[in-house]
Amino acid sequence: MNPSTLKPSHTHPSLLLPAPSPLRTQRRRFRVSLPRCSSDTNNPASSSSPPQRPPKELNGIEILVDKLSSPARLATSAVIVAGAVAAGYGLGSRFGGSRNAALGGAVALGAAGGAAAYALNAAAPQVAAVNLHNYVAGFDDPSILTREDIEVIANKYGVSKQDEAFKAEICDIYSEFVSSVIPPGGEELKGDEVDKIVNFKSSLGLDDPDAAAVHMEIGRKLFRQRLEVGDREGGVEQRRAFQKLIYVSNIVFGDASSFLLPWKRVFKVTESQVEVAIRDNAQRLYASKLKSVGRDFDLGKLVTLKETQSLCCLSDELAENLFREHARKLVEENISVALGILKSRTRAVPGVSQVVEEIEKVLAFNDLLISFKNHSDIDRLARGVGPVSLVGGEYDADRKIEDLKLLYRAYVSDALSSGRMEDNKFAALNQLKNIFGLGKREAEAILLDITRKVYRKRLGQTVSSGELEMADSKAAFLQNLCDELHFDPQKASELHEEIYRQKLQQCVADGELTDENVAALLKLRVMLCVPQQTVEAAHAEICGNLFEKIVKDAIASGVDGYDDETKKSVRKAAHGLRLTKETALSIASKAVRKMFITYVKRSRSAKGNGESAKELKKLIAFNTLVVTKLVEDIKGESPDVKIEEPKIEEPEEIRESEEYEMRITSDTQENKTGQRACRKDGKAWSDRITLKDDLPEKDRADLYKTFLTYCLTGDVVRIPFGVEIKKKKDDTEYIYLNQLGGILGLTGKVIMDVHRGLAEQAFRKQAEVLLADGQLTKARVEQLGKMQKEIGLSQEYAQKIIKNITTTKMAAAIETAVTQGKLNMKQIRELKESNVDLDSMVSVSLRETIFKKTVGDIFSSGTGEFDEEEVYEKIPLDLNINKEKARGVVCELAQNRLSNSLIQAVALLRQRNHKGVVFSLNNLLACDKAVPSQTLSWEVSEELSDLYTIYLKSDPSPEKLSRLQYLLGINDSTAAALRDSEDSLLETAEEEKFVF
């Protein structure tokens, strides 16, 4: 560089254009810019080029300093000082006339010359700064400024870069450069800002602390501009510019930024706000890099992206999300194009191939990313490399899933267009399912639907060409066809069944299967390998539905609609549809049982027992006139042949039961007579179809009981004036009853229980009236026996009812006596001797109450006796209560009564009731005998002595007297003295005053 060119000039405008050349006659000024607010964005000059800055000019002594080089300036300074000293000395000598005056003049003018020399040298840093400013302003690109250029200027003027003025100019240049490099708020970072700033800072030789101070000052300017902006939009732009400054500055200074850039302290921002600024700008910068790469990924670009991520200070998680989002958007572009073609109304056949082509691009792109994911140097590649997914994007919505299904269906159709599924296509379908995010069931449903159609088409072709029929192994042929289409053999079997069913429905369209139909079905079954079980199920369902419809039509008209034409149609259907008798009867049974249930519902909803029985009679008539004929026609039996009704036999266990014979003795003859009459009329009924599995046994028994009650009571006719007349019972009702039992599917035991229950109910009502007082006399026994025979109840059940009634009455009386306290142990033992079961009549709690009352009576009897065997053994045995629990009751009562007896004895003593005193003391001794006690305490010992004296006079036994002495705590000497002076003690006791 030629230092002679470093001359201050304000005649050359400065522009940020290509680097200057020393030989150029025209130089441009260096212009810098700060981010503008929104109010300045409307000005083209503010957005396209920074405002011009005027050059700096030298004034006064600065011009002289600029003319002199550093040595010349120093020499000039020396000359000035020396000249001033010499002039001062000369003037002092001339005017002062003495040596001292000469020296004074030399000092004075020397000082002035030194000041002038100092001023000349002090202006050098400012002159150097102005020349540096004007020199840089002449560059089109200030980044070409080097450290050597700055040193040349500094050396020319003999200044240091640390001089305040020179250093301030360097910082201003750096500030303008940083402000020009960082784009304004509305623009995004390009990614080269950090390198430019770092290189320029190095060129200037600026230390990190000084450079950091410049960054903070730029931040203050942006912060002030944000506060000065009046609109919200401008504030947002300034905030974004401030965020970019934070992001770029943190990268420029690296780890040192934590203490060199005090954003939080100076600008009162939080740590999270700083992190957000760094994160958002890093994301935008990395996203712009991804956008520039596009879909042309290779190993080198992925490595570059990884390096870019590191330079951007972007976390792996965010980089991974951005990469996946970029890949998803690329795939979404292909999907949108494919959907546009697929949904186009003017789409032609070539359009389908274009749709498939777009999907192939998606699959190829996905395969490319998967291959990079499996790379050995995956850590050196960009984060997020892997399978593409549409989750979180435009097509991750319920309303978009149908569009993806359309594309998936189109690709499946294309994959099967050749009549087979290639392995690579099958694998691609799985990848496409994962990319689209389709569920397993959704994808399988689409694949199954199209594969079924293709399989059915190829199956039809093989059948038409005879290829399948000529195959040696039809199962192997079909299996091979499934393998070519990747079709599940189980689904193929279901399709075969569907085809067979369709063929069967075509064959039975006219209501019967001809021999030709049977042969065709057999041939189809063999070719399709349809199992016999499946064939039977299909026949049972399809033919069964036809037969069921005919049966329903036959029975819908009721008892009068089953005519010859109906019979003919039933026979034709039963035999023409090739149904087995069991299958046909099973189908007919369902329809018939529904009609039975209808009659049952009507019977239940009827108001009275008679109306309910009439509905049941309709049920019986329907069974006789319709169901029986229907069963005959299904079985193929001739209606002209009389069908002898089988002899009704009851089950063996009932037939051998004595009670059963006694129960139906009176009804058997009527029943048999009615059956014979029915057989003479040639009317038979069938019990082939019953309600055994349709109604609970209890409900069926109730229906039977309803009709049985009707048979016993007969019809009731109401005539005017509220009079009811019972019609004479008809024997045929019992035949209907027998048929109803068969229709209901009741066993002989259940029927027997119903009959016996009614008999017991009738006998119980009459017996309760007769035994109202609970007394069973001989006359009443005879009367009850007569009633038993009339009703037909066995002796065993009659005795149980009688015993139950008498026992209930007696139990109520005994319970009342116990509650009122009128029942003692003597009476209880008399009842037990009379074989009265007290355990069932009297509850355990009441028996325990009796025991407690009995023990209480013993402790209050005044005898002073307690029989342990009686209380602990005999009484609990008679009452059938727990002995250990009884002992506990005795102990509790004895302990309570013991102290109470002493208190009662003292009270009676104070009342001078000597007899009562002896009575209470005997109770005390009885309680003590049951539960031995310690010596009792009493506050007034004289009263205890009086009690002993009074008891002594009652002439007790020595054992009782000795025990009482112990309980009252009277020693032997006192007892002897009391015996000797009993008369005087009594007289003294009469004179005492008792305070109550």
Swiss-Prot record:
Residues 38-73, 121-244, 368-613, 720-996 are stromal. Belongs to the chloroplast envelope anion channel-forming Tic110 (TC 1.A.18) family. Residues 93-100, 263-349, 632-702 are chloroplast intermembrane. GO terms for biological process: protein import into chloroplast stroma. One of its GO terms (cellular component) is TOC-TIC supercomplex I. Keywords: Chloroplast, Disulfide bond, Membrane, Plastid, Plastid inner membrane, Protein transport, Transit peptide, Transmembrane, Transmembrane helix, Transport. Part of the Tic complex. Interacts with TIC32, HSP93 and CPN60. Interacts with the Toc complex components TOC75 and TOC159. Binds specifically chloroplast pre-proteins. Residues 1-57 are annotated as: Disordered. The N1 region (38-149) is sufficient for re-targeting to the inner membrane and proper insertion. The N2 region (150-269) may act as a start transfer signal, but it cannot direct proteins to the inner envelope. InterPro entries: TIC110 (IPR031610). Induction: Down-regulated by cold stress. PubMed:9632730 shows that the region 121-996 is located in the stroma while PubMed:18986981 indicates that it contains probably 4 trans-membrane domains resulting in 2 regions in the intermembrane space localized to form supercomplexes with the TOC machinery and to receive the transit peptide of pre-proteins. Involved in protein precursor import into chloroplasts. Forms a voltage-dependent cation-selective channel at the inner envelope of chloroplasts, which specifically responds to a transit peptide. Calcium acts as an effector of gating and selectivity. It comes from the Eukaryota. The chain crosses the membrane at residues 74-92, 101-120, 245-262, 350-367, 614-631, 703-719. This is Protein TIC110, chloroplastic. Residues 1-37 form a transit peptide. It is a multi-pass membrane protein. The gene is TIC110. It is found in: Plastid, Chloroplast inner membrane. Contains at least one interchain redox-active disulfide bond. It comes from Pisum sativum (Garden pea). It holds the Pfam family Tic110.
